[in-house]
């Protein structure tokens, strides 16, 4: 059998046409060294800052140092199987995490993988963990409240939707308790909560998750956990991952609340990574960009305008503004708020709630120092009734603290000073609150009203809290209509004031406390 040349060329042509050749062009390099989860790679010429790199064994890393002849990367996860000479490939992608309503009620790691044993997340969307914060034009001023359910915070340092309010204090003085109570109090308030646990013991994180489950708060909460046993890279990334999950709701005209517990541990993790990458250390051995580490994270919490939401959703959501409220936690050493990281975060946030160990040990819990705690923008968001009634409380407390210091040395006090000290003692007692028992607006209003109008002045200090509890029960049974009016209008009319005065007098006469 003989083939002529034209047949051969036709056969070759048909074979070539049927061939699907695809080239996967990817830059690759070689591992030079691996130490403490930090890898040096030679030969990766075309790599982005923050790009994901692919290592053998389905392991990924993050390119952080781009130098002339090598790349410094941090490995996400286990790195024991990576050795010198391994091939590393670029992916052309920035690190992304899953986002969307499917994440609500789940416990995830810093990369968005479920760690609660409830099966896969099945999120339909992913988003980059590093994003630029909304510009000035797209923002709205804070005007709606986030009720924490804590008397001392809602009355003296109110928080608004879209605000960044720092919770700062020494270890073991109730910072996490304030944050968890705030989450529990959001039941039925159409606010998605995200709790980011950074560098905490796994047992502590488990206790928080269990408490959220018991109170039914996990139904509207996402937990992102990077425990103390996880690598520094995971602890560094967890807040950004949580923030991206919160931004999904903010950008679609919903409200979200994110708690970073705590950012001191994130700064430590970032310092560790930076020193291992041989970046020059600065004050307290932190790298030069530790301020930017927190500012770029906290600036992403904002209240965005209706126009921003409409533009982002391509006109699907109209007339709704979204918000992401941040409650970062910072741990101080021996009450030193002038250290590097605390001063940085104080300057970035819109106010701080300062918790003191001395107050905590004295049984004043939540241990809030009213003199140093401020909310720079929350006043505009406070509910009318609380705003009306809380002005006197702050002044009473501030004057009491000042006078109490002098009263230790003075034996004979005039009547006015003595009265002020007595009032201050009762107000201090009134602001105490057990954990996991947040209050509704009407309960807070009634407590403040009774303090402002002198109904506590003739009580023993030890009777203040039983009186408050009894009063709430009495109003629930005998004055349900008054409660409903306060709760619906979030205000106290002249008629309601008279009704409340009458109810308080009746309750005091009954002595049922």
Curated annotation (Swiss-Prot):
Topology of the protein relative to the lipid bilayer: Peripheral membrane protein
Binding residues for ATP: 169-176
InterPro entries associated with the record: ATP_synth_asu-like_sf, ATP_synth_asu_C, ATP_synth_asu_C_sf, ATP_synth_F1_a_nt-bd_dom, ATP_synth_F1_asu, ATPase_a/bsu_AS, ATPase_F1/V1/A1_a/bsu_N, ATPase_F1/V1/A1_a/bsu_N_sf
GO cellular component: plasma membrane; proton-transporting ATP synthase complex
Cross-referenced CDD domains: ATP-synt_F1_alpha_C (cd18113), ATP-synt_F1_alpha_N (cd18116), F1-ATPase_alpha_CD (cd01132)
First-listed, main subcellular location of the protein, grouped into a coarse class: membrane
PROSITE patterns to which the protein is assigned, alphabetical: ATPASE_ALPHA_BETA (PS00152)
Catalytic function, reaction form: ATP + H2O + 4 H(+)(in) = ADP + phosphate + 5 H(+)(out)
Site entry: Required for activity: 373
EC code(s) of this entry: 7.1.2.2
Molecular function per GO: ADP binding; ATP binding; proton-transporting ATP synthase activity, rotational mechanism
Localisation per UniProt entry: Cell inner membrane
Keywords linked to the UniProt accession: ATP synthesis, ATP-binding, Cell inner membrane, Cell membrane, CF(1), Hydrogen ion transport, Ion transport, Membrane, Nucleotide-binding, Translocase, Transport
Subunit structure: F-type ATPases have 2 components, CF(1) - the catalytic core - and CF(0) - the membrane proton channel. CF(1) has five subunits: alpha(3), beta(3), gamma(1), delta(1), epsilon(1). CF(0) has three main subunits: a(1), b(2) and c(9-12). The alpha and beta chains form an alternating ring which encloses part of the gamma chain. CF(1) is attached to CF(0) by a central stalk formed by the gamma and epsilon chains, while a peripheral stalk is formed by the delta and b chains.
Function (record text): Produces ATP from ADP in the presence of a proton gradient across the membrane. The alpha chain is a regulatory subunit.
Family assignment from sequence similarity: Belongs to the ATPase alpha/beta chains family.
Name recorded for this polypeptide: ATP synthase subunit alpha 1
Gene: atpA1
